[in-house]
Curated annotation (Swiss-Prot):
Annotated positions binding UDP-alpha-D-glucuronate: 393, 398, 432-433, 460, 492, 526-535, 613
The entry's keywords: Antibiotic resistance, Lipid A biosynthesis, Lipid biosynthesis, Lipid metabolism, Lipopolysaccharide biosynthesis, Multifunctional enzyme, NAD, Oxidoreductase, Transferase
Name recorded for this polypeptide: Bifunctional polymyxin resistance protein ArnA
Self-association and partners: Homohexamer, formed by a dimer of trimers.
Domain of life of the native organism: Bacteria
UniProt organism field: Escherichia coli O7:K1 (strain IAI39 / ExPEC)
GO CC terms, sorted: membrane
NCBIfam families: PRK06988.1 (NF005414), PRK08125.1 (NF005998), PRK11908.1 (NF008872)
Length: 660
């Protein structure tokens, strides 16, 4: 039976060996490159694959269409995943007629998600296990095929439990793989009401909070003992790691974090005391507790703390979903210019943010919000401010793919909004000037203008209505459940990195990018319905400064507000935009590399956007809320924005084949 395998870690190695022993034909193995910052105590899937003569790959994004196509060409009958660390897209799972199966290190539906081995120890569980289940779109939610229980002994630590899980996994696979091959398995649906889900753990999560019971801290020590990074605390500014510990239930009463004795090294906790049996000062060597006390200069009555005594104010953690997009990458640049922000980002690409990837306060994961729900929920919980910037926001897609617009722009964002409600996190949500629709007011006002859209048979309005409904949902959560929020409405922001010329080639871009492509390729500039529609164009730098001030939220003035961010002085028709762009193009130093101007061509909107499109004649913002809440005023003239945007795109064009 032909299979494609996704695998990593010891579980990946034993899963591959079990498949081969059961007579499966492995066409390819997908794994990960090792993280140099991670202590690799486990077997190498890549090395095993090479030794067995099996093709092995470690793509950054296995869900990329190119990899999906390559996997499809392998024609797998069944797919297996053994501790592969990325979610696998449904498009891949559907390639195998017999389905896809994942090995998970817990007794599902308990402990779905990441690091179940560590979490069961943190939580003081006495039982865990391994589960083989069918893979579905939602992580770890498919029907259970086989399950094996394991007792957790009081003296088990992470590595001993890991070895138990590996032994159990071998047994389970040896019993179950032949049945899958024969098509003779019994599947049991998971009980959703019993499900629990946990996110990934980082070394920073393992600090010892001395106000907690000693038993809780002891479980933390067990969960992250060597070869994991270890639980830690501080003496002043000196960090030390606790590798093994013991609970003392009847210790003398003392302030939590106080040293009760140094031989043994006994620390008072919220309930009981924790004996530090072995530990390590800084990057030194492991030593027994009394020697550690001497090394750290501890005496009876000394106080420990959970963070450095001189720790600076914690940086505000900002989660940006869609960080590689136009607003996301410019906002990241603005935030990192300051020293008090930590930016966490998710997107399906990284070309626009490559300049930040090595920044110590920028953390990026390449992924799709529709399949990385576990990662998103964990980071919503972890961060202070959430900006869900992912959306389809190009007009041609509103008529071309209305359901996809609804699914991404509404359904996926609603899930994120609910996470913010659940974890009581501040959300800064990108509404849109499109919500005003065909409003006839001279200035579109956030608090008074009516939101007017066309009939249902005009799918062009699905983006506007999706955003408007989310605005209303957020407002209701704010009113009824105390959600801290700000809605901002961008009015035609433009500048470098707005879309790209490849998107413009398929019509999926904003106006100025499409016009620049026409100039670059020597094709006529198309003026939809004559190009008389007027817009107020806003420089990205002005827009980002306003958005930055919303994040800063001086005096909490932005809470519960809707804020237009636009430049009412930069009003121009699309035809006028084209003329200004042409004038800038003709005097650009790279002009001679490109074809002659092919003129303007008037086209009907239905022939360009398709059936169901309606346009808006004017869209001018009132910016009184921005002035009041942000003390903000747009400053940059439209011509300057046009010149810089054009220059950016012209310098991205490969000129080698345009030499005269």
């Amino acid at each position: 039976m032909k299979t494609v395998v996704f695998a990593y870690h010891d579980m990946g190695c034993l899963g591959i060996e079990a498949l081969l022993a059961a007579g499966y034909e492995i066409s390819a193995i997908f794994t990960h490159t090792d993280n140099p910052g991670e202590k690799a105590f486990y077997g190498s899937v890549a090395r095993l694959a090479a030794e067995r003569g099996i093709p092995v790959y470690a793509p950054d994004n296995v869900n990329h269409p190119l990899w999906v196509e390559r996997i499809a060409q392998l024609s797998p009958e069944v797919i297996f995943s053994f501790y592969y660390r990325h979610l696998i897209h449904d498009k891949i799972l559907q390639l195998a007629p017999a389905g896809a199966f994942n090995l998970h290190g817990s007794l599902l539906p308990k402990y779905r998600g990441r690091a179940p081995l560590n979490w069961v120890l943190v939580n003081g569980e006495t039982e865990t296990g391994v589960t083989l289940h069918r893979m579905v779109k939602r992580a770890d939610a498919g029907a259970i095929v086989a399950q094996l229980r394991i007792a957790i002994a009081p003296d088990d630590i992470a590595i001993t439990l890991h070895h138990k899980l590996c032994h159990a996994a071998r047994q389970l696979l040896e019993q179950t793989l032949p049945a899958i091959k024969d098509g003779n398995i019994l599947e049991i649906a998971q009980r959703e009401n019993e499900a629990t889900c946990f996110g990934r753990r980082t070394p920073e999560d393992s600090f010892l909070e001395w106000h907690k019971p000693a038993s809780v801290l002891h479980n933390m020590v067990r969960a992250v003992a060597d070869p994991w990074p270890g639980a830690f605390s501080y003496v002043g500014n000196q960090k030390f790691t606790v590798w093994s510990s013991r609970v003392h239930s009847h210790a003398p009463a003392a302030q939590p974090g106080s040293v009760i004795s140094v031989a043994p090294l006994l620390i008072a906790c919220g309930d009981g005391a924790l004996e530090i049996v072995t530990g390590q000062a800084g990057d030194g060597i492991t030593m027994q507790g009394s020697q550690l006390a001497q090394t750290l200069g501890l005496v009876q009555g000394s106080r420990l703390n959970s963070q450095p005594a001189c720790a600076a104010r914690r940086r505000t953690r900002v989660l940006i979903l869609g960080v590689n997009g136009f607003i996301g990458n410019h906002l990241t640049e603005r935030l990192l210019r300051e020293d008090h922000y930590e930016v966490y980002g998710l997107d399906i690409g990284s070309d626009a943010i490559s300049r930040f990837l090595n920044h110590p306060h920028f953390h990026f994961v390449e992924g799709d919000i529709s399949i990385h729900s576990e990662w998103i929920e964990y980071h919503v919980k972890k961060c202070d401010v959430v900006l869900p910037l992912v959306a389809i926001a190009t007009p041609i897609e509103y008529t071309r793919n209305p359901l996809r617009v609804f699914e991404l722009d509404f359904e996926e964002n609603l899930r994120i909004i609910r996470y913010c409600v659940k974890y009581r996190k501040r959300i800064i949500f990108p509404s849109t000037s499109e919500v005003y629709g065909m409003c006839s007011d001279k200035y579109f006002d956030e608090d008074h203008s009516n939101l007017i859209v066309g009939p249902v048979n005009k799918p062009r309005w699905i983006y506007s209505v999706s955003k408007q409904l989310l605005d209303r949902v957020i407002w209701a959560y704010g009113e009824k459940e105390g959600l801290q929020f700000t809605l901002f409405r961008p009015f035609n922001w433009m500048g470098p990195r707005l879309d790209n010329l490849n998107a413009a080639r398929i019509g999926s871009s904003r106006a100025i990018t499409q016009l620049i492509l026409n100039l670059v390729e020597g094709s006529p500039i198309k003026l939809i319905d004559g190009g008389k529609q007027k817009r107020c164009f806003t420089d990205i730098r002005d827009g980002i400064e306003a958005l930055y001030r919303i994040i800063e939220n001086a005096g909490n003035r932005c809470d519960g507000e809707i804020i237009n961010i636009g430049n009412p002085e930069n009003e121009a028709s699309i035809e006028e935009l084209g003329e200004m762009l042409l004038a800038s193009f003709e005097k650009h130093p790279l002009r001679h590399y490109f074809p002659p101007f092919a003129g303007f061509r008037v086209v009907e909107s239905s022939s360009y956007y398709g059936k169901g499109y309606q346009d808006v004649e004017h869209r001018k913002p009132s910016i009184r809320n921005a002035r009041r809440c942000l003390d903000w005023e747009p400053k940059i003239d439209m011509q300057e924005t046009i010149d810089e945007t054009l220059d950016f795109f012209l310098r991205t064009v490969d000129l080698t084949d345009k030499q005269s």
